[in-house]
Amino acid sequence: MKPRTPPDSPQLFQAVPLVPDFRLELKARKAGHWPVAGADEAGRGPLAGPVVAAAVILDPKRIPEGLNDSKQLSAQRREELFVQILATATVSIASSSSTRIDETDIRKASLDAMRRAICSLAIPASYVLTDGLDVPPGLDCPGQAVIKGDARSVSIAAASIVAKVTRDRMMARAHHVFPDYGFAAHVGYGTAQHRAGIEKLGPCSLHRMSFRPLRKVEDGPQMDELISE
């Protein structure tokens, strides 16, 4: 006779993936804050390219279906949702270049881009939900940092999609200027292909020289300004 699975078996208690919803936004609204923006960034980890932040205020009556953490979506689905978000929500985008990242650090550059995205919204936010551990300093409204926020809040999820698609498009344009690095394929992350290009050519002006793998590498081809801050 096959033994029964004990009640505390991991088979019976597998983690259920989080699905973002509108509860955090409604909680803020109940506290008197409206509209509520979600904010997130893309590109903290790559060796090259900007970090891009987005802020999104969703229309509660026109929330696109299928919003989720951008990392959980295919590139095609991100593109589809990107178009829907721009058509139905208030959106603002800002970036910090690799130069800004090297001058400060990736955390400060990310928060600065997020602050500029939030402050540039056509409709000022009364409250902000951000992904991660920090709310950017210098905002004109209160906010809440939400760990795994892009899996909990549809507004943050929307911002994560906008930031990711925008940055991927920037790196696709960079590929036309510096084709030998393969930016279109890895969007700046430290893949074997990317590291081989750096070893062969040296870094270009999009590389983050403050990042450990690049600190002792000689300069390669340069470009004045592909991506402005």
From Swiss-Prot:
Cofactor-binding details, from the entry: Manganese or magnesium. Binds 1 divalent metal ion per monomer in the absence of substrate. May bind a second metal ion after substrate binding.
**Predominant location of this chain?**
cytoplasm
Q: Which family does this protein fall into?
A: Belongs to the RNase HII family.
Gene Ontology terms: biological process: DNA replication, removal of RNA primer; mismatch repair
State its Enzyme Commission number(s).
3.1.26.4
The residues the record assigns to binding a divalent metal cation are: D40, E41, D131
Ranges where the RNase H type-2 domain occurs: 34-223
What are the GO cellular component annotations? cytoplasm; ribonuclease H2 complex
InterPro entries linked to this entry: RNase_HII, RNase_HII/HIII, RNase_HII/HIII_dom, RNaseH-like_sf, RNaseH_sf
- Location in or out of the cell: Cytoplasm
What is this protein's name? Ribonuclease HII
* Entries under Pfam families matching the protein: RNase_HII
PANTHER family, per the entry: RIBONUCLEASE H2 SUBUNIT A (PTHR10954), RIBONUCLEASE HII (PTHR10954:SF18)
- What cofactor(s) does the depicted protein rely on? Mn(2+); Mg(2+)
Q: What's this protein's function?
A: Endonuclease that specifically degrades the RNA of RNA-DNA hybrids.
CDD domains given for it?
RNase_HII_bacteria_HII_like
Show the catalytic activity. Answer: Endonucleolytic cleavage to 5'-phosphomonoester
Upper lineage is: Bacteria, Pseudomonadati, Pseudomonadota, Alphaproteobacteria, Hyphomicrobiales
What keywords is this UniProt entry annotated with? Cytoplasm, Endonuclease, Hydrolase, Manganese, Metal-binding, Nuclease
Q: Which gene encodes it?
A: rnhB
MF GO annotations: manganese ion binding; RNA binding; RNA-DNA hybrid ribonuclease activity
